[in-house]
Amino acid sequence: MAIIKKFRIKSYKKLDTIIEFENVSLSYGNRLILDNINFKVNKNSIHGMLGPNGAGKSTIFNLITGLIKPKSGTIRIFGEEVNNYPVYTRTKKFKTGYCPQYGGFFSDLTLHDNLKAISEIVIDNKNYRTEKINNLITKFEFENLKDIKAKFLSGGQKKRLVIALALLSDPKVLLLDEVYAALDVLTIKMLQETIVNLQQENQITTCICDHQARDLLATCDVAMILNNGKIIAEGSPSDLVNNIEAKSAYFGDSFSIK
């Protein structure tokens, strides 16, 4: 697997926009969740989202997938406005994959049968189905785990299974929600390597939201910090940790990437 530098400070130079939020706002009743936010996710980049609980990170993922609609503003995927597109259209047309923080697999099925079940939904050709499953088992080193029920896998193994399930549909965009949550250091390192390899080998554009600031910044090309429904800082990992507003609202004065 690829060796992860301590922090990925240089961003990808491809400037084609894959996801764009333009003046997007969202409210739940009288509570303003997102307040006129604007950002772009560039092709093949790993784009991180940081912020305290309730800042709007998961809401952004729900807006991208189409689970909810914005109150105002425009969301574009591959340059096309998608505000009124349902979930299945966005998933199929724009080849987006979503990995939730919890679940995302069939607990009582084996790892192999999880892959088989989802492949039968997203892959029509039976021979390609088998080939794809075998390739993913090899890629994720699942050979010794394939006959174990998903509920008996470790936290990191479950996370990797959910990513593998998302890859069955050959996504161009991958959304990872709290991918590093409640995992040990070695498992996080393995997931970081997996994510960077997907960028380098499969040219997948990846968005990650997480609370683990150092782990996320070690993986990302670009990241942004949300607070009270607004993007308060955006840039490379080194830019963010030196941003005064980001330190005040999120990192604190003692945070360092060294």
Please state what every model-predicted region is.
Residues 149-153:
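Conserved ABC ATPase signature
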Residues 178-179:
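Walker B catalytic motif
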